[in-house]
Amino acid sequence: MSDIFQQYFLKIYWAKLFNSIKEDIDAALRLDPSARNHLEVFLTYPGIHAVWGYRVAHFLWKVKLKLLARIYSNWVRAVTGIEIHPGAQIGRRFFIDHGMGVVIGATAIVGDDVMIYHDVTLGARTNEAGKRHPTVGNNVVIGSGAKVLGDISIGDGVKINANVVVTKSVPARTMVDSSEFFVI
């Protein structure tokens, strides 16, 4: 009986993974004006490859194969330059554009339809056990170089501009920008 359950479970998992892959490619085509077709995105987008690697590693993490999940996610990081901890929780249609230097911590939670650019960190401000990484709502855009740090909440529809450091919760439908620069 357990073999039948395992086979059924794996069939469902692979069907969901395939659907997630298709949704991730569709999100890239919708969000990146330079993306020309499904095949190009499938073959050449390291952000997409990192997300798929995360989805496999997260499955391994959930079924208690944590060492294997960490080894696999480390390999994905070496190949893509993008580090997503397998314990993080990431929603549907997640898109990382360019991707190099992205770090997403173990207790981060990311909603659906989120887009982040290169060199973004969803990190901790402490090394204490427990929830220490941000929770990001749905339909959020995080610009390149932004750092979102600590156990904070980023509301739905937020846009965080480039190179902003966010250490406090942000309400829904808000734009976060650093102060204007000036010439001395």
PLM regions: where:
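Left-handed beta-helix
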Residues: 80, 85-86, 91-92, 97-106, ...
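Intrinsic structural disorder
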Residues: 1, 180-181
